[in-house]
A protein has these predicted regions:
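N-terminal post-signal-peptidase region of extra-cytosolic proteins
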Residues: 1-4, 27-41, 73-80
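Short linear motifs in intrinsically disordered
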Residues: 1-9, 146-147
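Gly/Thr-rich phosphate-binding beta-strand-loop-beta motif of the actin/hexokinase/Hsp70
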Residues: 9-18
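Glycine-rich catalytic cores of cysteine/serine-nucleophile enzymes that process amide/ester linkages
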Residues: 10, 22-50, 55
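Short, charged beta-turn/beta-strand-edge "cap" motif at the junction between a beta-strand
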Residues: 13, 55-58, 161
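A short, structured loop/turn motif at beta-sheet edges
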Residues: 20-21, 110
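Exported/periplasmic cell-wall-interacting domains
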Residues: 61-161
Length: 161
């Protein structure tokens, strides 16, 4: 199954993956602050993007990342309790780069410079509800499955409906 493209729907909180074999849907969670492109907004950027980098291949599904680097920690409920306010980035990171100059590429709206990712989140976090700080959160099993099949350059389109 080769992945052709990905669509993130902000209204339905769904990650739709278009493959040579059909369509696969995954629940996701985007920004609590809604759609938007400005640096510092905490919003999920709209428009056409591409996967710049895939980070974490070969790491355990519950590997913890800070600054796109594995910390050596493994997420557990006990670790979570010790850091209740941490914005957990787990498992895999698909780092997005905007394709639309002026909308999500360049200046104060650059998705890559804003560190917008599709990444794993703890199983205690709900899907289908916008709660992130701008990234697209997915269940650990789902992001690991997606990261294993996607390649850099894959187009990711983020739409409002």
């Amino acid at each position: 199954m080769a992945i052709e493209s990905i669509e993130i729907n902000l209204k339905t909180q769904n990650c739709r993956v278009f493959t040579t074999d059909g369509i696969v849907d995954y629940p996701c969670s985007t920004a609590l602050n809604g759609p938007g492109e400005q640096d510092g907004s905490g919003c999920t950027p709209r428009g056409s993007h591409r996967i710049r980098a895939i980070i974490g291949l070969g790491e355990p599904a519950n590997a913890v990342f800070v600054g796109r680097r594995p910390t050596g920690e493994r997420w557990t409920e006990q670790l979570h309790e010790g850091y209740p306010n941490r914005d957990w980035i787990l498992g895999r990171i698909l780092w997005l780069c905007g394709n639309d100059s002026g909308l999500n590429r360049g200046g104060k709206v650059d998705s890559q410079r804003r560190y917008i990712y599709i990444h794993g989140t703890p199983p205690t976090e709900p899907m289908g509800i916008p709660l992130s700080h701008g990234c697209v959160r997915m269940r650990l099993q789902d992001i690991c499955e997606l990261a294993d099949q996607v390649s850099p350059g894959t187009v990711v389109t983020i739409v409002e409906s």
